């Protein structure tokens, strides 16, 4: 699985066991992701942060 880094022109291949890509947004600004990468389990959203997860190459 390949996931985009913070700047989507760059990406990395995920290590074994991390089979989801994610992007994280601050709830105050849902237009600009503040973090992207590979993850094993999609975190729950909170009052401050929203996560969007997916499982295909460079989907984040």
From Swiss-Prot:
Disulfide bonds join 3-21, 14-38, 42-53, 54-59. Expressed by the venom gland. GO terms for cellular component: extracellular region; membrane; other organism cell membrane. Gene3D superfamilies: CD59. It holds the Pfam family Toxin_cobra-type. Keywords: Cardiotoxin, Cytolysis, Disulfide bond, Membrane, Secreted, Target cell membrane, Target membrane, Toxin. One of its GO terms (biological process) is killing of cells of another organism. Signal peptide: none annotated. Transmembrane segments: none annotated. It is found in: Secreted; Target cell membrane. InterPro entries: Cytotoxin_Cobra (IPR003572), Snake_3FTx (IPR003571), Snake_toxin-like_sf (IPR045860), Snake_toxin_con_site (IPR018354), Toxin_cobra-type (IPR054131). GO terms for molecular function: toxin activity. Monomer in solution; Homodimer and oligomer in the presence of negatively charged lipids forming a pore with a size ranging between 20 and 30 Angstroms. Belongs to the three-finger toxin family. Short-chain subfamily. Type IA cytotoxin sub-subfamily. This three-finger cytotoxin is a basic protein that interacts and penetrates into the cell membrane, with the tips of all the three loops. Cytotoxins which have a 'Pro-30' (P-type) interacts with membrane stronger that those which have a Ser-28 (S-type). CTI interacts with membrane weaker than CTII. This is Cytotoxin 1. It comes from Naja oxiana. The lineage of its organism: Eukaryota, Metazoa, Chordata, Craniata, Vertebrata.
